């Protein structure tokens, strides 16, 4: 087998327009990329613009490029849902016909009672659906006084445990999350998330010591099939957590987008074969959920400036794809994810550019990765043959 690389950059939550069923999710009119551009008076994305991202949705400041240097399209989500797990799983061939479990009114006693019993905790604070930054602001001081963790959920399938790093050691917080993960498996909750924070009342901030504990996939992913075929898979950022480390041969923790982009660039100097699968979380975590279009715009422009250094590492015959896992429109009243198309911008050195159209599933990306490495996979439709000779 030729030694070559396929790079996936997931710009977490950078959707590009509402899906036809967005109304059913309360997301009609969402367009993370387009609405952000208009909210800030225009975006400066010269690299992505030349690659053709302006063809995907109207972006103020980024007109459609008549002769794009990359292949461009968008992907629709076939799975039911609009969360991180659902989006990433579908990319790698797992399409969910039923959404993962939600608990909009908080978690019932049959979940919390065994959690308290096994952890030895006297109780929890919160147990509501809430914005993470808001509930930490509201309950952080009481948490520090009592030692009881803050438990909350959201519009996603998540059980989140927040604790101050000076009140609860990180390893204790992670141990609590492992207990919750085991209890929640039968309930089909996608993720248990450790949400550590620091600071003092009124000035609490979450840290990059976050850790996700994901439910196991209901089938085998493209990642596992690659590893079976002895193709290395490097997960960067929260990718290993999302797939419960199955189908991952190496991993790199990151502390935000700038760190993730720099580590990806450095990684390509030492990895000469395999899949490099990267999640850039700041779009979602710092700006989408906080309804901060200015911050979102700055993060997009930061990524655009970094792309040439990453794409310049690729050799002829290799591929890099930029995409997203869902939307999180910072201009809407909601602070939750949005049901959107996601971008598909593909750089293949020496192959030019063109349109990939609207893909019927995120799984087309995984099918293309499998095709690229000569691995058999049934879900999705590969676009490798559309990338030119």
From Swiss-Prot:
GO terms for molecular function: magnesium ion binding; manganese ion binding; phosphopentomutase activity. Its EC number is 5.4.2.7. CDD domains: PPM (cd16009). Its main location: cytoplasm. One of its GO terms (cellular component) is cytosol. Mn(2+) 2 binds at residues 284, 289, 337. The keyword Isomerase applies. Binds 2 manganese ions. Isomerase that catalyzes the conversion of deoxy-ribose 1-phosphate (dRib-1-P) and ribose 1-phosphate (Rib-1-P) to deoxy-ribose 5-phosphate (dRib-5-P) and ribose 5-phosphate (Rib-5-P), respectively. This is Phosphopentomutase. It comes from Anaeromyxobacter sp. (strain Fw109-5).
């Amino acid at each position: 087998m030729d030694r070559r690389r396929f790079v996936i950059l997931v710009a977490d939550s950078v959707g590009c327009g509402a899906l036809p069923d967005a109304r059913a999710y309360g997301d009609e009119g969402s367009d993370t990329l387009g609405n952000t551009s208009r909210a800030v008076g225009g975006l400066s994305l010269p690299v992505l613009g030349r690659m053709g991202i302006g063809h995907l949705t109207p972006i103020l400041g980024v007109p459609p490029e008549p002769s794009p240097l990359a292949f461009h399209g968008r992907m629709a989500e076939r799975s039911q849902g609009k969360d991180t797990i659902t989006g990433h799983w579908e990319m790698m061939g797992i399409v969910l016909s039923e959404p993962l479990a939600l608990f909009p009114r908080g978690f019932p006693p049959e979940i919390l009672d065994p959690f308290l019993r096994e952890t030895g905790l006297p109780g929890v604070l919160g147990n509501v659906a809430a914005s993470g930054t808001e509930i930490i602001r509201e309950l952080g001081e009481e948490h520090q006084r009592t030692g009881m963790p803050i438990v909350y959920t959201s519009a996603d399938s998540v059980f989140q445990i927040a604790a101050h790093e000076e009140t609860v050691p990180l390893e204790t917080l992670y141990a609590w999350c492992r207990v919750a993960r085991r209890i929640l498996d039968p309930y089909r909750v996608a993720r248990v998330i450790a949400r550590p924070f620091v600071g003092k009342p009124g000035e609490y901030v979450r840290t990059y010591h976050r850790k996700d504990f994901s439910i196991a996939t209901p089938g085998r992913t493209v990642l596992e099939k690659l590893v079976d075929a002895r193709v290395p898979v490097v997960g960067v950022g929260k990718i290993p957590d999302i797939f419960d480390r199955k189908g991952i041969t190496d991993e790199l923790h990151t502390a935000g987008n700038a760190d993730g982009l720099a580590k990806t660039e450095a990684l390509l100097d030492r990895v000469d074969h395999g899949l490099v699968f990267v999640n850039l979380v700041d779009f979602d975590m710092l700006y989408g959920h906080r309804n901060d279009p200015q911050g979102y715009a700055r993060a997009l422009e930061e990524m655009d400036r970094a792309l040439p250094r990453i794409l310049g590492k690729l050799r002829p015959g290799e591929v890099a794809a930029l995409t997203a896992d869902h939307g999180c429109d910072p201009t809407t009243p909601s602070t939750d994810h949005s049901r959107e198309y996601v971008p598909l911008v593909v750089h293949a050195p020496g192959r030019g550019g063109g349109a990939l159209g609207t893909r019927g599933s995120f799984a087309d990306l995984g099918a293309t990765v499998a095709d690229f490495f000569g691995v058999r996979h049934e879900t999705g439709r590969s676009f490798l043959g559309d990338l030119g000779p």
